[in-house]
Amino acid sequence: MDMFPLTWIFLALYFSGHKVRSQQDPPCGGRLNSKDAGYITSPGYPQDYPSHQNCEWVVYAPEPNQKIVLNFNPHFEIEKHDCKYDFIEIRDGDSESADLLGKHCGNIAPPTIISSGSVLYIKFTSDYARQGAGFSLRYEIFKTGSEDCSKNFTSPNGTIESPGFPEKYPHNLDCTFTILAKPRMEIILQFLTFDLEHDPLQVGEGDCKYDWLDIWDGIPHVGPLIGKYCGTKTPSKLRSSTGILSLTFHTDMAVAKDGFSARYYLVHQEPPENFQCNAPLGMESGRIANEQISASSTFSDGRWTPQQSRLHGDDNGWTPNVDSNKEYLQVDLRFLTMLTAIATQGAISRETQKGYYVKSYKLEVSTNGEDWMVYRHGKNHKVFQANNDATELVLNKLHTPLLTRFIRIRPQTWHLGIALRLELFGCRVTDAPCSNMLGMLSGLIADTQISASSTREYLWSPSAARLVSSRSGWFPRNPQAQPGEEWLQVDLGTPKTVKGVIIQGARGGDSITAMEARAFVRKFKVSYSLNGKDWEYIQDPRTQQPKLFEGNMHYDTPDIRRFEPVPAQYVRVYPERWSPAGIGMRLEVLGCDWTDSKPTVETLGPTVKSEETTTPYPMDEDATECGENCSFEDDKDLQLPSGFNCNFDFPEETCGWMYDRAKWLQSTWISSANPNDRTFPDDKNFLKLQSDGGREGQFGRLISPPVHLPRSPVCMEFQYQAMGGHGVALQVVREARQESKLLWVIREDQGSEWKHGRIILPSYDMEYQIVFEGVIGKGRSGEISIDDIRISTDVPLENCMEPISAFAVDIPEIHGGEGYEDEIDDDYEGDWNNSSSTSGAGSPSSGKEKSWLYTLDPILITIIAMSSLGVLLGATCAGLLLYCTCSYSGLSSRSCTTLENYNFELYDGLKHKVKINHQKCCSEA
């Protein structure tokens, strides 16, 4: 009985205490309007939250198009254990069934969370065990600032500034600035001030976490990203020629800085009529900024940085931390650029005065900095021969220009250690006449304007076929379709003058295999239309059939294919052959406004002098493999190296031809526009070798780009002039790796008039070069001039021997001057010997005994024998006589030339005369 009142007292105290505690606890959960910013905290924050909590909040925006942003206080403490017991979760909607944006616990505050719609669901749960301080977050409407700061710029010049400049910029901004230029206008952007929040622990440039500025070559997130910038380092000057340059500015809710200010202006581009792709790209001049140069490593003392790798720099050069062929120097050109040549130097240490240089290197290129291709020579990686001392400049010219953005030089051998300075040569695609990018890369062409015959899946849709910027590419439904069955089409929006396409393979995606990631098109055709219904193919002017264009050899490296201008609004590309991985393609169309096009003469070949030229275009590892519909039949189109045809119109410009500098120190071919009152071709400049009768005389060599004609011979034409009596000689030699062959020679005064020379360049399995060699003997006055060297497609081969006297082989050859001392100084070791020529013994001064067989004409003998003795007996006798005649004393007279030119074949007793190539003499029978 006594315990009963005591029990009631305890119960009363318990419930009264519980009531007091409940009155002290803040409300847990609710529905909150984010029109006015507010805070949500765990119960009791910053003290330990209670156990057995289950709080739910719904935060909503007043407008359906508004978003909500949550920012957490860094003081965050919720029991760990993988968030099984205590946790806070945020869902992108108004209930527990909405998409989960995050589930958090532990001691690290969650990052900023932004809703996709106008509602967020927040839930906090705790169990009976240990507790912590909990959380505190701020909710508010997510303000992008787009209405205030996003803007398009179309005026010729202007200023772009961060919102509020020069005051600190606001939080939570996402602004877009777009500069739009008219055709043939270049956009130049230069920053005046730059100060954005950055991470103190930032590893490298572009590693921006909080506030940043992205610059795009085109529409944001469509065109290629040029760079991401933050901190206080001012970006260097940018030059864009695609017609659109965009900036996207992002800020978070924390620290704000002063922002940026930049000036832009538009510059009119007018390409020269005789466009040459050989300009220095800016390593020496500084146009390539320091931030664009990087390396695999740098020597530890900090005196041999990548930024010291500029050609002719006076402060050391670049040296890696360890001398290894795995090290590389990298240059980011920022935009797609035609690379035509590379010049290298070593360096002399300012500390030790020792010379270091690279003796050989490999070249790697990429359009995105991720997928790299090693430049190849056939199936093997091309190894460029570089320097022989620390100061010498050596130029390596690429056989075919490469379209790329990122370039790596990877040293292979070196002297004492790796030290490198360099310059890059080339041009932009848009530098050529009527070669504007019409919008695939920049995004000016919308996704709806790109279509295809079929597509594999969303990631490989036609809209993914944008050059470079796409993360994948177009892939048809059937990876091994019939040739010409599949196509990719671009609607340009309005009629344009179309002059070419840039084709690129497809990049790998998450849903494909490694094999499929290397898909590219090897050969293709192009058709065009003004209305989308009536289509015409680009024609081969020689065959009047649809032209079969060469495609890619690597899935990342783009290739330009040009053709005669055509009016078109719709362009289709038909893959004809492709890699084993199937059809994969990215594309850009080149051209200009319909009224802008005009006939021009353009040459994409480099005109810089070089020490070495590379051999055929680089090939991928899979280049020798082919799908079931792909064959290795050689293209019948003549593919001459860029710069072979040359009229030398501009001083110091020799197209793809080069001087032999090792023998050019005593005299130089000079460009002249003063013909001394004598006729010369079309009143143009030309090359001239001249001597005034001095003791040393003159000797010069002019060397062509590499030529590869494995299937059919062609006719080379040129104009020449030779004055100076018997002391003047001009000859043309074919030089291959293991042999040289004399093709054409004159050694007498030709008068003051210009004359035409024509030579058949025979088919040859190996790559070779054509060399013009001119000699004016010691003590002789004379002049040799050359102009307008070109391959002619309208001259029949039977008419391609001019003058005939230049092909006679009984004119003596020079062997280091032997037997010709009175006419040409033997100091000129012109290597006029011909290892493949018919003879070398028969010269007038040799005193060799003449024979009656030496004077016989084998043609006459053959005709008489076959007419007199009948077909069978005549053939037998003719064979014996030919053998005796040709083999006696090497037969270096006109008789051998006659036999070289003709071959007799018997068909049913009839005699047929057939022209053959001038490659082998009859003495080889």
Swiss-Prot record:
SMART domains in UniProt: CUB, FA58C, MAM
PANTHER family: F5/8 TYPE C DOMAIN-CONTAINING PROTEIN, NEUROPILIN-2
Domain characteristics, as noted in the entry: The tandem CUB domains mediate binding to semaphorin, while the tandem F5/8 domains are responsible for heparin and VEGF binding.
Family: Belongs to the neuropilin family.
Residues bound to Ca(2+): E197, D211, D252
GO BP annotations, alphabetical order: angiogenesis; axon extension involved in axon guidance; axon guidance; cellular response to leukemia inhibitory factor; dorsal root ganglion morphogenesis; facial nerve structural organization; facioacoustic ganglion development; gonadotrophin-releasing hormone neuronal migration to the hypothalamus
Sequence ranges assigned to domain MAM in this UniProt record: 642-802
Domain (CUB) ranges: 28-142, 149-267
Description of what induces expression: Increased in dorsal root ganglia in response to injury caused by dorsal rhizotomy. Increased in dorsal root ganglia in response to sciatic transection injury. Transiently increased in dorsal root ganglia in response to sciatic nerve crush injury, returning to comparable levels 42 days post-injury.
MF (Gene Ontology): heparin binding; metal ion binding; semaphorin receptor activity; vascular endothelial growth factor receptor activity
Ranges of the Cytoplasmic topological domain: 884-925
Chain intervals for the UniProt region annotation (Disordered): 297-317, 601-621, 820-849
Transmembrane regions: 859-883
Record's bilayer topology term: Single-pass type I membrane protein
Disulfide bonds: C28-C55, C83-C105, C149-C175, C208-C230, C277-C427, C434-C592
Protein name (record): Neuropilin-2
Record field: compositional bias (Acidic residues): 820-830
Expression tissues: Found in certain neuronal populations of the CNS, including dorsal root ganglia, and in other non-neuronal tissues including mesenchymal tissue lining in the ribs.
Keyword Transport: no
Keyword entries, A-Z: Calcium, Developmental protein, Differentiation, Disulfide bond, Glycoprotein, Heparin-binding, Membrane, Metal-binding, Neurogenesis, Receptor, Repeat, Signal, Transmembrane, Transmembrane helix
Sugar-modified residues: N152, N157, N629, N833, N834
Compartments reported by the entry: Membrane
Primary residence: membrane
